[in-house]
Design a protein with these regions (language model features):
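N-terminal leader segment of winged-helix/HTH proteins
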Residues: 1-24, 72
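Short, locally clustered residues in the helix-turn-helix/winged-helix DNA-binding domain
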Residues: 7, 35-41, 99, 126
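Short, hydrophobic-biased segments on the C-terminal half of alpha helices
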Residues: 46, 64-65
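N-terminal helix-turn-helix DNA-binding core of bacterial DNA-binding proteins
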Residues: 15-59
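C-terminal regulatory/oligomerization modules of transcriptional regulators
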Residues: 115-150
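Charged, amphipathic alpha-helical coiled-coil/dimerization segments
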Residues: 65-123
Length: 150
């Protein structure tokens, strides 16, 4: 089925990142956090990491504390109680050795697609996400209603 094929491809893509994390000696959550810092920018908040990765807040907090203890980053209060993530020199080196090569490979893969193919890929992924999101919300809302009224 199309769904089975989509799920197989999705899993294989995820496996590429999990294998990379493992080869670099990083947990999946640390890899995702570093990737997010690379993508969103230094000085981002823990909330930004949670929003970008869908990793639970407690897991992000634990992984960031570990990275802080290992000397890869510091947390800085700039506004209120929000903690901004700042990389140390070791953190910048870690990013250059682990995340940058992955981003480079991703960019290289995208350059193999035409402009139209890139746009179509993004358009279809967004459409698929929106449809899944709508169906999930509807299912969730109907499940709650059934629970209360049955």
């Amino acid at each position: 089925s199309n769904l089975r094929e989509y799920n197989r491809i999705y899993k294989e893509v995820n496996d590429i990142y999990r294998d990379a994390a493992s080869k670099f000696g990083l947990s999946n959550s640390v890899f995702d956090i570093l990737y997010t810092i690379c993508e969103v920018g230094e000085g981002c908040l823990q909330k930004d990491v949670c929003d970008a990765t869908f990793i639970p807040k407690q897991t992000v907090n634990s992984a960031i504390r570990k990275l802080e203890q290992e000397g890869y980053l510091t947390l800085s209060n700039r506004k209120g109680h929000s903690k901004h993530i700042l990389l140390t020199e070791s953190g910048h080196t870690l990013l250059k050795e682990t995340i940058f090569p992955i981003v480079e490979a991703e960019n290289e893969a995208f350059t193999e697609l035409s402009f139209e193919e890139c746009n179509l890929l993004l358009k279809l992924h967004n459409k698929h996400f929106t449809l899944n999101n709508n169906v999930s919300k509807s299912f969730y809302e109907n499940s709650i209603i059934r629970t209360f009224y049955l």
